Amino acid sequence: QEGVELRQAGLAQPVLVLGNLTHPDELRACLHWQLMPTLSGMREALLCQNLAAGSGRAMAVHLKLDTGMSRLGAPWQEGQRLVEAIAALEAVQLAGVYSHLADADAPGAGLDPLTRQQQQQFEAVLTGLQQAGLPSGARHLANSAATLRSPGLHYDLVRVGLALYGHRPAAHLGGGLALQPAMQVRAR
């Protein structure tokens, strides 16, 4: 919905849809409005292939890998196999590979063990892709917390969430930034 509104407002830059789109109508809207859906498996990739091939134009997508968040994404161990399969699809273009950090806002200096493990798993997939000569497109791992505290996790893109809305991802992060909340949540 938000991606369509951005297009209707005249935004021409690439727009990545971070949610899990599995219904053909959702993916058809992505194709029509030139939005990049997030894929978490071959089912969605094949739907994109069929829709895009029928329209005569390619569809750019990002593949999300689950490295520990356990919310959305293909198991990271399947990353290289999925990229190989997606690369073989004529009407689907892999524009990026990403994952989401589960605990990047943990207190303490440096990376917490889970974030370090997630980075290692993500790196293992990227290394495998490079060695096999497969495309990764834009690589992205950093959420707001990792953007603020871990430059080594920035790769090609960062995905700020809470910080975009003027909120620090944790009380101990971003204290030197002049973030101004863009929203409030109230309840009675």
Residue ranges and their predicted role:
Residues 1-35, 39-46:
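N-terminal active-site wall of soluble small-molecule enzyme domains
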Residues 33-71:
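A generic, well-ordered mixed alpha/beta core segment in the N-terminal half of proteins
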Residues 10-16, 58-60, 132-139:
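Short beta-strand/loop segments at the ligand-binding rim of alpha/beta enzyme cores
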Residues 12-17, 33-34, 57, 113-115, ...:
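Short, hinge-like loop/turn segments at secondary-structure boundaries
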Residues 17-22, 54, 95-98:
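Short hydrophobic/aromatic-rich motifs at helix boundaries and adjacent loops
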Residues 46, 50-51, 67-187:
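Active-site loop/helix belt of alpha/beta enzymes
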Residues 7-12, 28-32, 48-58, 83-94:
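Acidic (Asp/Glu)-rich catalytic clusters
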Residues 26-33, 59-66, 98-107:
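Acidic/polar active-site rim loop that often engages polyanionic ligands
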